[in-house]
Amino acid sequence: MNPNGPYPGRQLFIGMTLNSSPAVAYLVTGRSPASRERKASPLDNGIIIGPIGNQPYDPLRHYTGVKYDNASGIIAVSNGIQTEAIFETYKLLFNTGSLPAIDFMEELLDGARAEPDSLHTPRIAGIATNGMNNQPVFILGLKRQEMPAKAFQVEPAPGTLTGISTYKGNLENPEPNDPDNLSKIEFKGKTAIELAEHLFEISKAVYNGDDIRVCAIGGIRSEDKHTWQVAMRNR
């Protein structure tokens, strides 16, 4: 079962595999047909959450969900327009030898603001980058409508990923999540597709007779410490 309940909305996790390789995962769910009519697709060094078939592009529902760089080993994941800004900011910090402080995550999420929908869906984001001595650094953040963004540096144990979701999990009455409401999943696999499948399978839920799962994405950094293996599972 999903640790955030049957309806997490959008959800992301960052952490490490059992052999201490950085890992990320991202889940998209939707109660309405429009929310479910999209899929994850690879594009250059990233994954987009886009339309199915010839449906028009909708900037609220369609976005870059994952962006990574196989030179620096950085990966960013989020539920909207903030993904590329977060990726480029932490890539710049890495390239200039600056520390990857959480302040940058908070400022970028504050700039993105909550989504302009009826629920004021929070913005969530995660980054896996490198700090001093090329050690991995993991940061999560959430921005709610009525409060400043809050970010955390996560120090996961091997085989554990820490995550955050947009909603608290109630399928009938979704509520924006709190930034302190972090959750964890255990992962014993070794590949990106195993991680994507694992998150997809534990998140099965039905609303008005329809499976709410849209897609799940998994990413694991190789032992060379900079190359990402990324895979996806669509409904």
What are these regions (language model features)?
Residues 1-235:
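Conserved short alpha-helical segments that host acidic/polar catalytic motifs at enzyme active sites
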